[in-house]
Design a protein with these regions (language model features):
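Intrinsically disordered, low-complexity regulatory segments
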Residues: 1-169
Length: 169
């Protein structure tokens, strides 16, 4: 065990560690609060903005990141028809890319047959205020398309801030 002097010295270090943790947690909480303040106006305000450009997700890029391309686009709406190399349409524009659709595509064609998928993205949404349902995609909390009025900005801010707070513990 500790002697009296060693015990006294260790109590100082323990108290210092606890106060440092409290301060780091406060800083992480402050960051979360600022993120929420900035993004609170971003809401789901329309069903469709009419965007046809979307974001390109490639097989090569997904493999380099260590992710499956189909898993990356699950829960998103297609910005263009999904075609195989022969030109056969596997899924139509504005169709929700679901797990069932991914399974159907994988059963019907070789995975290497599809090199890229164009999806709708919040980054390309054409609305002047807010985000549309088709650019946002699935609400992962409820496993269904997002509803009008959902506070997408606050969800995003909390999704960034919460792990930061956890890392300080």
């Amino acid at each position: 065990g500790f002697g009296v002097l060693e015990y006294f010295i260790s109590t100082h270090a323990t108290r210092k560690g606890l106060s440092d943790t409290a301060l780091r947690t406060a800083n992480a909480g402050y960051l979360t609060r600022r993120l929420v303040d900035v993004s609170q106006d971003v809401m789901i305000t329309a069903d469709d903005c009419g965007d046809k450009e979307g974001l390109v997700i490639t097989k090569k890029e997904s493999d380099e990141m260590g992710y499956d391309m189909f898993k990356r686009v699950t829960g998103r709406y297609l910005a263009r028809d999904l075609k195989n190399k022969k030109g056969k349409i596997l899924a139509r524009v504005d169709e929700l890319f679901s797990e069932e659709l991914a399974d159907k595509i994988l059963k019907g064609a070789a995975e290497s047959d599809i090199e890229e998928i164009h999806i709708r993205s919040v980054l390309n949404c054409k609305l002047h205020r807010g985000v549309c349902v088709k650019c946002y995609g699935y609400d992962l909390g409820y496993n269904r398309p997002v509803k009008l009025g959902t506070a997408a900005g606050i969800i995003a801010a909390q999704s960034i801030g919460e792990p930061g707070t956890q890392l300080t513990m």
